[in-house]
Regions:
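Class I (Rossmann-like) S-adenosyl-L-methionine-dependent methyltransferase catalytic domain
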Residues: 1-113, 130-212
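A conserved beta-strand element that flanks and buttresses the S-adenosyl-L-methionine
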Residues: 119
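Short catalytic micro-motifs in class I SAM-dependent methyltransferases
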Residues: 122-126
Length: 212
């Protein structure tokens, strides 16, 4: 009984860092999370596909492509996906094998590639370390020719998330200060807002940026 009690009361392992967390998660067979599946994924695809169609977007770059499930609903003429996880990238390459409109690379190999639209979906609030967040945001806007779409929470309230793989950020303020050539042109609230259960609601909304 003691060993059973001990197993159930061991302290949680310390957070290993953003990059290590996601590589370990995907390597162990984990996925991108509920936000990339089912009705959440359908809502996101509806908004993104409409934007691409309405603005005649021909090229898309995404930072944080994950396991590729969300991408399976996308209708992008040309797509380049980056991720920190080699395991996630391997899944994407296998899933979209033979699709010449899509390519995938490790974000460590980013070499200044640009696209008309740069995407960040369910990523910003998973960038726990300040330096990782800063590097990610600068890379995201550097890669965009005309549009940036961020799907994330926009708050600095992290009560209950300390020590986890989630860190909410007031990222719109960061953009105002650090990317003044870009302006928020539209915000799309989530069709399924968070009401206490992450399986049925999300704390992320869409934030659409364009060049001034």
């Amino acid at each position: 009984m003691y060993w059973k009690w001990l197993a159930n009361h061991r302290p949680a392992a310390p957070f290993p860092g953003t990059v290590a967390y996601w590589e370990q998660r995907y390597a162990a067979g984990g996925d991108s999370g509920v936000g990339s599946y089912d009705f959440f994924a359908e809502f996101k695809a509806e908004v993104l596909n409409a934007f691409v169609r309405e603005h005649g977007v021909q090229s898309v770059v995404e930072f944080g492509c994950g396991d590729g499930n969300q991408l399976g609903l996308a209708r992008y003429p040309r797509y380049l996906g980056f991720d920190v996880s080699a395991a996630a990238l391997a899944r994407c390459r296998e899933r979209f094998r033979g699709d010449e409109t899509k390519s995938f690379r490790n974000v460590a190999d980013y070499a200044g590639e640009m696209a008309e639209l740069a995407l960040s979906l369910d990523v910003v609030y998973h960038l726990v370390e300040d330096e990782v967040f800063e590097r990610y945001m600068r890379q995201l806007f550097r890669a965009a020719e005309h549009h940036v779409i961020v799907y994330a929470s926009d708050t600095a309230d992290n009560r209950g998330f300390e020590g986890t793989h989630v860190r909410h950020r007031k990222f719109t303020r960061w953009i105002e200060v650090n990317e003044p050539r870009w302006q928020l042109v539209r915000q799309v609230p989530n069709r399924y807002p968070y009401r206490g259960d992450y399986r049925t609601g999300s704390f992320a909304d869409f934030f659409v940026y364009g060049r001034r």
